[in-house]
Amino acid sequence: VHAWHQGYLRALRQRGGELRCNRELLSARYANDGGWTLQLSHGEVIQAAQLVNAAGAWADHVAERCGIRPVGLQPCRRTAFTFAVPEGVDVSRWPTVIGIDESFYFKPDAGQLLGSPANADPVEAQDVQPEELDIAIGVHHIEEHTTLAIRRPNHSWAGLRSFVSDGDLVIGSDARNPAFFW
C-alpha cells in the first residue's frame, strides 16, 4: 500500500499537483471563470481549477464547505487485529477466509494472521479506536468456525469505511459542478 501511495504522489507531482497536509478547509468558492478559491487554516488561500474530494468519512463535510450538495455518506467503524500463526504452520499462501454470513474474515499478513469481525458500525466521522467487544466478537467467530486458537491479539486498530444508502461507489465529477470530483 505504501508503494502505491508513493507512486500516486509521484504522478501527482509530475503533473504539477500538490499535496497539502495538516490543513483544514474552512471554505471554498467556485467561479466559472477562475475555478476554485480555497480558504485554508492559518490564512492560506489556494487557487485550483479542479478540486478532488478525497476526504473519506469527512467527504460530505468538505462538500458542504464547497457549496456542493452532500451525497449522504455514512462513516462506519471497522475493527481489525493481528494474531499469531499456529506454531510450525506456513500461512503465507493461505487465501483470505470470509465467513459465509460475512461475520468475520482473516488472512495472512506480514507473518501473522489479520482478523476482523467485518463490522460496519455507523459512527460520526472521527479518529476511531478499536472496541474491545468488536475484537472479542471477531476472535469468537474465527475460533468458532475454524480450528484456530487465538490466545490474544498482537495489535488492534479501527478505521472508517464510508457508504451511501445504495451501497454503490461515489466517484466522478459532481453532477452540478464538474470541477468538483468525488
Predicted regions located by residue number:
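Active-site lid/adjacent beta-loop-alpha segment flanking the redox-cofactor pocket in flavoenzymes
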Residues: 69-72, 85-179
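Central helical "cap/lid" subdomain
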Residues: 44-95
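A generic "binding-loop/recognition-motif" signal
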Residues: 24, 58, 77, 102, ...
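Helical element adjacent to the flavin cofactor pocket in flavoenzyme catalytic cores
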Residues: 1-50
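Structural motif
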Residues: 35-37, 45, 80, 103, ...
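Mid-domain beta-loop-alpha active-site segment that forms a flexible
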Residues: 1-11, 56-58, 134-141
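Short glycine-/acidic-enriched loop or helix-start segments at secondary-structure transitions
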Residues: 30, 62-64, 125
